[in-house]
Swiss-Prot record:
Protein name (record): UDP-glucuronosyltransferase 2A3
Keywords in alphabetical order: Glycoprotein, Glycosyltransferase, Membrane, Signal, Transferase, Transmembrane, Transmembrane helix
UniProt similarity note: Belongs to the UDP-glycosyltransferase family.
PROSITE patterns: UDPGT
Assigned GO CC terms: membrane
Top-rank taxon: Eukaryota
Transmembrane spans: 492-512
């Protein structure tokens, strides 16, 4: 018996040693709101696997709750500036301005907003990198890897200053600029649509013209933020000239929050890993009151409605338009909404400050999902095979819904011009037309039929970078080429010069021969 206990203790010690043999230290530069919800899933899994995770954040986040007891460690810097006004301006812009504009106008407006708040973002960055006590502490900790959401600039600068290899996690940048210019992601414009344009991989001639023009617009004019401003700031912080693409381009792995159940087929680099839906999981039981309401729907089922964590209120007029449409369907509706109760609200609709969205979408009685097209919600719908009514508002949402429309799993309506009839028609279409449910289930089967789960793949590559101090063997040589070398402009120029030289020499030889021939004939005639 004693020997059995000794063997058990020895085995446990061995397991402990093996488990900690791969344990490392992870530093995180996150983005708030829905981005944080996605990244947090990765961090929790890293903790389960024994890693030490430290999150960098400021003192006034929206969803990053650093005060709540957690296995995560937080390094918090004080932000004297209240960002409430900026958030309100952004919500107003997204809800009331952007939906009524064309693609380029909305992108320009969005770009202008980010240029306006660059001072706040710079202040936040400075509060980290010029905090000598914090930077010394971070350097002495010797982190193995840094996980960065590049939507907020400065994470790559932190990694450079700390000399830590880093992994990026993102859905897309504005116009896909960062992935294409800094990550060297191939993007043939003939069949790869520029992100955030609402185009698909099946483009007409005029759409390909539009795609090419928008690519130029995004590349030379509209960018995620003021590149010149940040490159000047980065160069000053590093004490040497640099560019955003130089620092961002040093990413070892790019974790893209999509997968081929969502994306159109396209070429990609070996250090790009698609991990869409990593936050999705089987549905859990609903709260009793909510379950009773769902069961009361009978054979008609339920509709789940959410515009995400950012847009929980709409104007009273818009709320009444929505409520009026919902009141006319036989399904019960669970609507995440914090505003004033609409006067047209039907008895079949209940309002909630918060809903267990994943659990509702996984409920067998769910018939449709009304969504703004956020990536997290889209993937929960794909995971559970639920058809969608898309009401995109801004950013990548138009693109996300366009993908779902192209795959036959969604109907889109315009948020700005939407009427009760539009919403009612869209709901009836996705609920009564069985093709939408069939296509949603097809995407769900594709999503579930992966050799390795998205979350496990994401964690694997983070751990891979930790174990190998990077992933340089996956880095394309394109990073070391100038733009004219990358597009073979120098080769094309050389070949054109060769052709021009050959034509020139041929012409000269021909003219010389003609002159000789003419002289010979004249001499013969004289004789």
């Amino acid at each position: 018996m004693r020997s059995d206990k000794s063997a058990l203790v020895f085995l446990l010690l061995q397991l402990f040693c093996v488990g900690c043999g791969f344990c490392g230290k992870v530093l995180v530069w996150p983005c708030d709101m829905s981005h944080w919800l996605n990244v947090k899933v990765i961090l929790e899994e890293l903790i389960v696997r024994g890693h030490e995770v430290t999150v960098l954040t400021h003192s006034k986040p929206s969803l990053i709750d650093y005060r709540k007891p957690s296995a995560l460690k937080f390094e918090v810097v004080h932000m004297p500036q209240d960002r409430t006004e900026e958030n309100e301006i952004f919500v107003d812009l997204a809800l009331n301005v952007l939906p009524g504009l064309s693609t380029w106008q909305s992108v320009i407006k969005l770009n202008d907003f980010f240029v306006e708040i660059r001072g706040t973002l710079k202040m936040m960055c400075e509060s980290f990198i010029y905090n000598q006590t914090l930077m010394k502490k971070l350097q002495e900790t010797n982190y193995d890897v840094m996980l960065i959401d590049p939507v907020i600039p400065c994470g790559d600068l932190m990694a450079e200053l700390l000399a830590v290899p880093f992994v990026l996690t993102l859905r897309i940048s504005v116009g896909g600029n960062m992935e294409r210019s800094c990550g060297k992601l191939p993007a043939p414009l003939s069949y790869v649509p520029v992100p955030m344009t609402g185009l698909t991989d099946r483009m007409t001639f005029l759409e390909r013209v539009k795609n090419s023009m928008l690519s130029v617009l995004f590349h030379f004019w509209i960018q995620d933020y003021d590149y010149h401003f940040w490159e000047e700031f980065y160069s000053k912080a590093l004490g040497r000239p640099t560019t955003l693409c130089e620092t961002v381009g040093k990413a070892e792995i790019w974790l893209i929050r999509t997968y081929w159940d969502f994306e159109f087929p396209q070429p990609y680099q070996p250090n790009f890993e698609f991990v869409g839906g990593l936050h999705c999981k089987p549905a859990k039981a609903l709260p009793k009151e909510m379950e009773n309401f769902v069961q009361s729907s009978g054979e008609d089922g339920i509709v789940v409605f959410s515009l995400g964590s950012l847009f929980q209120n709409v104007t009273e007029e818009k709320a009444n338009i929505i409520a009026s449409a919902l009141a006319q369907i036989p399904q019960k509706v669970l609507w995440r909404y914090k505003g004033k109760k609409p006067s047209t609200l039907g008895a079949n609709t209940r309002l909630y400050d918060w809903i267990p969205q994943n659990d509702l979408l996984g409920h067998p009685k769910t018939k449709a999902f009304i969504t703004h097209g956020g990536m997290n919600g889209i993937y929960e719908a794909i995971y559970h095979g639920v058809p969608m009514v898309g009401v995109p508002i801004f950013g990548d949402q138009l693109d996300n819904i366009a993908h779902m429309k192209a795959k036959g799993a969604a109907v889109e309506i315009n948020f700005k011009t939407m009427t009760s009839e539009d919403l009612l028609r869209a709901l009836r279409t996705v609920i009564t037309d069985s093709s939408y449910k069939e296509n949603a289930m097809r995407l769900s089967r594709i999503h579930h039929d992966q050799p390795v789960k998205p979350l496990d793949r994401a964690v694997f590559w983070i751990e891979f970078v930790m174990r190998h101090k990077g992933a340089k063997h996956l880095r394309s040589a394109a990073h070391d080429l100038t733009w004219f070398q990358h597009y073979s402009i120098d080769v094309i120029g050389f070949l054109l010069a060769c052709v021009a030289t050959a034509i020139f020499l041929f012409t000269k030889c021909f003219l010389f021969s003609c002159q000789k021939f003419n002289k010979t004939r004249k001499i013969e005639k004289r004789e």
